[in-house]
């Protein structure tokens, strides 16, 4: 039985926890919250550190030096991070759901995730090039498969 099936999120080692991240990059997108409805909207404006092809942070280990507001996702706060997409492995496991069939822990690489359209690859712009963030609202980050 795989570690994510036999352990709770809080029982996982830091290496196991980190490996749960599929690297889709959706959590690195700028998001907006409607002041009146409190509805969350994703944009295609990506963090300046996000590599648009590999969908990985270019400075993950020292990202807070560049982006102090970057959020650390932990077993303790994952339930509060309602802005994480439904496809996020952390959110799925916290809700008692299984990893999706395209997850790199199941497939051995990010290829299936990219082919399934579940990553930011080829869909984003650098946040520094965005003038009116409202013009960049997108729905595709909300997509969830199996």
Curated annotation (Swiss-Prot):
It comes from the Bacteria. InterPro entries: Puta_zinc/iron-chelating_dom (IPR005358), UCP006173 (IPR008228). Coiled coil: none annotated. Belongs to the UPF0260 family. PANTHER family: UPF0260 PROTEIN YCGN (PTHR37421:SF1). NCBIfam families: PRK05170.1-4, PRK05170.1-5, PRK05170.2-5. This is UPF0260 protein SO_2573. It comes from Shewanella oneidensis (strain ATCC 700550 / JCM 31522 / CIP 106686 / LMG 19005 / NCIMB 14063 / MR-1).
């Amino acid at each position: 039985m795989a570690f994510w099936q036999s352990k709770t999120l809080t029982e996982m080692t830091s290496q196991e926890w980190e490996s749960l991240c599929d690297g889709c990059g959706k959590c690195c997108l700028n998001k907006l919250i409607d002041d009146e409805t409190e509805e969350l909207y994703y944009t295609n404006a990506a963090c300046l550190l996000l590599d648009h092809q590999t969908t990985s942070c270019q400075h993950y280990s020292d990202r807070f030096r560049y982006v102090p507001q970057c959020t650390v996702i932990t077993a303790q706060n994952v339930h509060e991070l309602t802005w994480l997409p439904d496809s996020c492995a952390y959110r799925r496991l916290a809700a008692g759901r299984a990893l999706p069939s395209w997850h790199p822990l199941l497939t051995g690489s990010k290829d299936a995730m990219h082919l399934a359209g579940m990553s930011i690859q080829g869909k984003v712009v650098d946040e520094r090039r965005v003038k009116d963030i409202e013009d960049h609202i997108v729905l595709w980050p909300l997509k969830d498969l199996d």
